[in-house]
């Protein structure tokens, strides 16, 4: 199970791979279909499975991604499942995001240097790891509570 699902247009694969590499460098696992899927896998099913098991969706919101029916389906599923969604823009202003994602605060990387982009990726990775740690703590407390409750009987 990946921590993050990267939704992107195939035209943006190079940037998606850059993002995935830097997330891995920050100890955050990321599903990226062209890299994460093995030959012979039924990719629509695997993509939906990866999306449903990831808590976060990073949407590489380029003009081509916003026009892609596949990306729209992925984001529709993410919105319905109430995933934590971060639109990342670089080739258009956030104000041009489609209405179905325009109300999410976007990360605007237009004109950012490689070092600035890496710093922003590290910041997002920190949020994801913090969120994951909170979830693990809650799960641990629930298990401990169930164990304590069960041992009283």
Model-assigned labels for residue ranges:
Residues 1-56, 83, 137-153:
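Conserved N-terminal substructure of TIR/SEFIR domains
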Residues 10, 62-63:
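Short glycine-/small-residue-rich Rossmann-like dinucleotide-binding loops
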Residues 13-14, 40-41, 65-69, 114-115:
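Loop/helix-junction capping segments adjacent to catalytic residues or to phosphate/diphosphate-binding pockets
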Residues 59:
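Redox-cofactor binding/interface segments in oxidoreductases and associated redox assembly factors
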Residues 63-83:
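Conserved TIR/SEFIR loop-to-helix hotspot centered on a Trp-containing motif
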Residues 85-90:
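Conserved beta-strand/loop subsegment of P-loop NTPase cores
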Residues 93-104:
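Glycine-rich, charge-decorated loop segments at or immediately adjacent to ligand/cofactor-binding or catalytic sites
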Residues 102-129:
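Juxtamembrane amphipathic/hinge helix adjacent to a transmembrane helix
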């Amino acid at each position: 199970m990946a921590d993050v699902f990267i939704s992107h247009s195939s035209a943006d694969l190079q940037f998606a791979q850059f993002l995935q590499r830097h997330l891995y460098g920050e100890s955050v696992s990321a599903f990226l279909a062209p890299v994460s899927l093995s030959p012979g896998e039924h990719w629509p099913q695997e993509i939906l499975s990866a999306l449903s098991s990831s808590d976060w969706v990073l949407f590489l919101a380029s003009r081509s991604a916003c026009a892609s029916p596949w990306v729209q389906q992925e984001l529709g599923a993410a919105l319905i499942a109430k995933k934590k969604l971060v639109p990342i823009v670089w080739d258009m202003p956030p104000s041009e995001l489609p209405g179905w994602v325009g109300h999410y605060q976007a990360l605007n990387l237009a004109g950012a240097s490689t070092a600035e982009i890496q710093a922003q990726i590290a910041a997002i990775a920190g949020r994801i790891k913090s969120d994951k740690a909170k979830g693990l703590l809650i799960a641990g407390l629930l298990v401990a509570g169930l164990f304590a409750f069960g041992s009283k009987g």
